[in-house]
Each structure stands twice: as C-alpha cells, then as structure tokens.
C-alpha cells in the first residue's frame, strides 16, 4: 500500500493466508453505555499506538476504532468509525460475519431467501486471494440481486463481490437481507458509506 509492505502471521495454514484482520481478538474498552426510554446504546473503542499493543507491530499506524451499538424497536444499528492518527494514509477494510438463526419468523428453512447488493464477482485464486479480475455474475449469483437464493439450499458462498445497489421497496439498498417469503418479515444488514 503506497509503497509499504505489511506482513501478517499465517492463520490458515492450508492456504498460507492470514485472515480476520488485526482487531478480531483485541479487547475493546466500553467508553459509553446508556439506557433510555426507547433505546439502549453501547459504545466501545480501541486505541492502537506504538506504546501499547501488538497490533501496531503488524500494522504500524496509530488509530482509534469506535463501534457503537443502538438497540431500538426498529432494530439493532451498528456504527463503525475509524480515526487515523498516523502521519500517513492507512489501508482499511471492515467486515463482519453476522450469524442469523433461521427460521426467525416461523415456517420452515425453505421459506427464507437471501438478497445481496452485488455487482460483479471478484475472481479468487487457489489461496482465496483476489486476482484483480472481475467477472460477470453467474446465473446462481445473479439471483442474489433479483429474487434471492434460498438460504438453506445454496450452500456456503465462498466468493467475493463488488458492491452495486439493489432496489428494495422502491429504495436503493446496499447490503444483505434475509426474507421470509410467506410473511415478508426481513432481517436487513445495510451498509452506509460516509
């Protein structure tokens, strides 16, 4: 990145890869917690700097990561903000593996479909690393943009994608949603870019 090389420990031996990022197992400090009439909010932060942690050893940037969770009657909102305190720009990627219990609105597993705001498939090599090539979506992955894939019938999706908004209820949507086809009950995981 900008002439700098980052070296991380191997965490997937069979692929000789590192995964899950530098903050996955780090302890965050609860900096705020509030319970109001209609909302519960918890804010956690992590400060990386040369004097206090091993993260800096592999990723030599001083930064602050703040994660805020808000629970209301409308749902759970998660906000992630990074503050770069370094003298240089730092590369950044954020990802979460959010588990969902299905069925969450009754019925059977086959009643649920998943839709994703995907654009193109990112080609991966034998080590599951991006090759730099982008491919058109396969027929199966094209369903993610349209009617959705049956959640329990598609198997694991071991692929990377570019982001392209989809239409949900007449509005642009960036993210993933799982919907119960009979009732219309949804769980949404939406991304907003700042």
Where are these regions (language model features)?
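Short, well-ordered beta-strand segments enriched in hydrophobic/aromatic residues
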Residues: 69, 76-84
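Histidine-centered catalytic micro-motifs
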Residues: 22, 93-101
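A short secondary-structure junction signal
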Residues: 55-58, 79-81, 91-95, 112, ...
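Short Pro-Gly-centered flexible turn/kink motifs
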Residues: 1-8, 80, 189, 194
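Extended, loop-rich substrate-binding clefts of extracytoplasmic carbohydrate-active enzymes
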Residues: 4, 9-73
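Hydrophobic residues positioned within well-ordered beta-strands of beta-sheet architectures
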Residues: 42-44, 65-67, 78, 94, ...
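Short coil/turn motifs at secondary-structure junctions
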Residues: 49-51, 74, 85-87, 103
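Active-site/ligand-binding surface loops and adjacent short beta/alpha elements
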Residues: 89, 99-193
């Amino acid at each position: 990145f900008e002439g700098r090389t980052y070296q991380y420990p191997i965490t997937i031996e069979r692929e000789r890869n590192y995964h899950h990022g530098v903050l996955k197992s780090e302890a965050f400090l609860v900096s705020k917690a509030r319970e109001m009439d209609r909302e519960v909010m918890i804010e956690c932060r992590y400060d990386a700097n040369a004097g206090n942690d091993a993260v800096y050893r592999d990723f030599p940037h001083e930064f602050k990561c703040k994660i805020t969770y808000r629970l209301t009657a409308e749902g759970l909102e998660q906000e992630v903000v990074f503050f770069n305190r370094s003298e240089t720009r730092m590369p950044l990627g954020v990802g979460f593996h959010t588990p969902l219990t299905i069925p969450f609105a009754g019925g059977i597993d086959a009643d649920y479909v998943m839709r994703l705001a995907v654009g193109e498939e990112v080609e991966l090599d034998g080590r599951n690393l991006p090759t730099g090539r982008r491919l058109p979506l396969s027929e199966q992955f094209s369903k993610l943009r349209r009617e959705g894939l049956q959640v329990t019938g598609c198997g694991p999706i071991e692929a990377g994608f570019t982001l392209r908004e989809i239409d949900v209820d007449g509005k642009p949507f960036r993210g993933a949603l799982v919907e119960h086809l009979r009732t219309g009950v949804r769980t949404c995981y939406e991304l907003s870019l700042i």
